Every structure is written in C-alpha cells, then in structure tokens.
Amino acid sequence: KIDMRLKRAVAVSESPFTFNTQTYLHQGARWECEVTLPPLSYAEARSIEAFIVGLIGQSGTFTFGHPLHNTAGVSVGLGSNADIRATQIIGGSNSSAVSAGTYFQLGDYLYIATEDKVQGANALKFEPPLRQAISAGTACDFTLPKSLWRMSNNDVGWSTDVASMYGFTFAMVEAL
C-alpha cells in the first residue's frame, strides 16, 4: 500500500469578525509518502531491514517511484530552457500528448501534469514547481518516474508476527 500526497506551504489569515480569508502561496511544496509492504518472510525481509537501517535515519537518500505510475510510449523533450520554480514547460515540436494526472520525472524529481497537453510544441503544465533549472532538449521520463527521498524521521522499526512474517511501514519525504 502506498499513500502519497503533495504538501504545500500556504498561509491563511481569517478575520474573526467577517470570516473573510486571505491566502498566501509560499514557494514550499514537496511530495510525502507512506509505504506498507506486504508480509515478508525472514529471507525476504533481511534486505529491507538492511536498506532501512543503512539509510541512517534522515541522513541517507534513495530514489523511489510509485510502481503504478508508468506511462510508456510518451515523449516530451523541452523546446526551451525552464527556470527553477516554473510550473510549465514548452515541449519540442515532436512532443507527445500528455493527459492530466500523468506522472513524469525531470532530473531527480517527480511531477504530475495538471492539464492535458496536446501533441507538438505546446505547454505542459505541472506541479510541484521545478526544483532545478532544466536545459532545452532535456527529456521528461514517463517510464516509472522516480523522485529523490529521505525518511521522514530517524526512527526505524518493523514488526514480526507468530508466523515469523515481517511487516514494514515507513514514511518518507521528498529530499529537496
């Protein structure tokens, strides 16, 4: 089981008299995720234990992507440079169509298309904003896209039942 969310830094101020609100969208946005693995035998669990302990809490990073977020046969190459914090890129003239809700990778980070993009040199709108500047000609990766992650806390643990089956649940945040 995988629970994913996009966390945003948004400030909200509400009047105690009129309940009118004002919002301010700060730059912060990151993916967060909790993963629960199916029950594993001792032999299967050993490598998971070693991996989690080897991360040394929040100090280590790793790549991870949702195994169901795979879109084969889609190709989008950037037609121009894209600055950090951008939320759209212009595809090259041979770029494929992309449906809203499609995940992709640029550099070390995961993004989701927020609107349909038609084939050709059109804008691909996405969230969260770019984490790094991207050069023209860079290709978006739609095949098992991943992001760079770290554990969300320094505690590691797992459970074992009477049948010697191991259970793992761990939380992670995008490593920015």
Q: What label would you give each PLM region?
A:
Residues 42-48:
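Short, conserved charged micro-motifs
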Residues 1-6, 66, 73-74, 95, ...:
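Small/polar beta-strand repeat architecture
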Residues 1-13, 33:
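N-terminal targeting peptides, primarily Sec-dependent signal peptides
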Residues 12-20:
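Short, solvent-exposed beta-alpha or beta-beta edge segments that form flexible loop/patches at the rim
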Residues 46, 54-106, 115-120:
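Autoprocessing Asn-cyclization modules and mimics
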